[in-house]
Regions:
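Non-heme Fe(II)-dependent double-stranded beta-helix
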Residues: 2-24, 30-131
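Conserved hydrophobic/aromatic beta-strand scaffold that supports enzyme active sites
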Residues: 5, 26-28, 119, 140-144, ...
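Short, conserved beta-strand element in jelly-roll/cupin
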Residues: 128-150
Length: 180
């Protein structure tokens, strides 16, 4: 059996959410967004995704669209970033090594049929070796606006790998898919 990411209900306690973040490095909170929010996000993002601009390399995906600067482009995306529950979780998770949080990056991603799986990577790699491994510099969120499955490109997550040594590589059965 392959690895799994724990799913919690939308009303799960902050403590439960943080427990799985700290232990596993990931948790999925189910049914957080209602239909009205999903419709607003779809309405805001559709004009940008209709432009059909795809990645230019294997990492970003030749059949993957990415739209950045979402706070400037979408009121609904801005509301997601400012959700008190998310900010509270991020502040608590990162508190040991920071005074507050800063939004670093926003991106809408649409994966078209025929895309290959992105290579496994650690997001913290954007800092090279400048941030000691004992310091966690990131708290990332992924919001599934449409079904997010292994078959259509759900993000691969290696549960617990945030505690591994840098050179340790995942075995295939250690890879979970952020299906939601």
């Amino acid at each position: 059996m392959s690895a799994q990411i724990t799913h919690l209900p939308a009303n799960a306690s902050r403590e439960d959410q943080l427990h799985f973040m700290e232990e596993d490095g990931a948790v999925i909170i189910d049914d957080v967004l209602g239909n009205k929010q999903l419709q607003a996000l779809d309405q805001d993002l559709t004009p940008f995704l209709q432009q059909k601009v795809f990645g230019r390399d294997a990492f970003t995906g030749f059949y993957t669209q990415r739209v950045g600067a979402l706070i400037a482009r979408s009121k609904a995306c801005g509301e997601l970033a400012l959700r008190p529950r998310i900010l509270d979780a991020a502040r608590t998770y990162l508190a040991e090594h920071c005074d507050d949080v800063q939004l670093h990056f926003t991106s809408a991603v649409a994966i078209a049929p025929g895309e290959s799986a992105q290579i496994l990577h650690r997001d913290r790699g954007i800092w090279g070796g400048y941030v000691p491994r004992q310091i966690e510099p990131l708290f990332s969120t992924i919001w599934a606006l449409t079904p997010f499955t292994r078959e259509n490109g759900a993000t691969q997550v290696v549960v617990g790998s945030h505690r591994w040594e840098k050179k340790r590589q995942a075995d295939p059965d250690e890879i979970a898919y952020a299906e939601m």
